[in-house]
Amino acid sequence: MTRPVRTRFAPSPTGFIHLGNIRSALYPWAFARKMKGTFVLRIEDTDVERSSQEAVDAILEGMAWLGLDYDEGPYYQMQRMDRYREVLAQMQEKGLVYPCYMSTEELDALRERQRAAGEKPRYDGTWRPEPGKVLPEPPAGVAPVLRFRNPLTGTVAWDDAVKGRVEISNEELDDLVVARPDGTPMYNFCVVVDDLDMGITHVIRGDDHVNNTPRQINILRALGGEVPVYAHLPTVLNEQGEKMSKRHGAMSVMGYRDAGYLPEAVLNYLARLGWSHGDAEIFTREQFVEWFDLEHLGKSPAQYDHNKLNWLNNHYIKEADDARLAGLAKPFFAALGIDAGAIEQGPDLVSVMGLMKDRASTVKEIAENSAMFYRAPAPGADALAQHVTDAVRPALVEFAAALKTVEWTKEAIAAALKAVLGAHKLKMPQLAMPVRLLVAGTTHTPSIDAVLLLFGRDVVVSRIEAALA
């Protein structure tokens, strides 16, 4: 194909957008960027009852968060109704579509008879004009639907970039309704007109659309359009092996941001959820665009793995700038009841991020683990009884005294701790655990010297002495 590459993401704004949905934006975006092409955003909002501005906003917000910028759009199908009606009128003039007066009740009865006879339920062409055929008299006061005159013979075939060669006999396809009785164009028709008008060369979408493809190809050919390359992506499964959906517990795209995931981690994970480049697991956005191709799209359903996402997010958190993490963490601190004033009065937040990030899978987890720096310690009675024993109290007193005069560096704190351990013949946990408990309120912290350094001399000494008084 010599035409400049033009891809599209065409979601329906009917509610929830999860990772499986947004993957259908990621791959066409990446392919357009790889091929120096154009990425088009189209909002397919013909389902007026279910579509909402809130859902549109969620789509736009999710794309922006992941950095999936579009070159054209967003186009809204409801704003293009005049164009669809114009094309329908042209097709009706050429005999490519025709009015059908079969009622819903008649169509249901026809399908029941076909099922009873062991036949595939389908429209039988009662109102389809043919040479020499006498059509029924149109019923008075009944508005017809418009149906597309699907070819009666031959096959519809395309070489799907994922599924390979697909062939459907036209005998399997009935005449599709392309406009409702009130004249409103139908979804499958609007899609074809949009793809034609927008010059779409590659349609990369979920394989739940594959059954629409032969009908769309026939309409496109009737309009004189060039058939695009199709790539129908296998579905994304949740961890239980079910199709990913809100009903089955899927999280929204922005839910990942709100849970403390970094967009680069989610994008990296999403890229591998149905595509691969050798054994590469971790790669930048730029590498992904450079490597992306349709040939390496997976042919089997991809299964979501939350632990894998956490592993990737931890990697990107460790690589992230500490000041950036500090900014991202503030809303999570606020949710814990730690306001800006408490953070301002406590240890330097950027330094805290640098110390605490390595162990965390999410930014939310960093904030939870770092809350000890911005709260008064409140160790439980059982923990105090276990760790702050009469045997260790003299060592705690001596350690607090030593900290009053040492140079306030990580190395000097570690040396003071080692000296007290030696003098009292204690092992590291016997002293480090009670110090952690009295200063931070928990025994679970990174290296004791690094933690004390951030708390600061005055806080450390005063908390140990107050607990021993």
UniProtKB/Swiss-Prot annotation:
Domain of life: Bacteria
Keyword rRNA-binding: no
Intervals of motif 'HIGH' region: 11-21
Name the UniProt record assigns to this protein: Glutamate--tRNA ligase
GO biological process, one term: glutamyl-tRNA aminoacylation
Organism classification: Bacteria, Pseudomonadati, Pseudomonadota, Betaproteobacteria, Burkholderiales
SUPFAM superfamilies (UniProt xref): An anticodon-binding domain of class I aminoacyl-tRNA synthetases, Nucleotidylyl transferase
Main location: cytoplasm
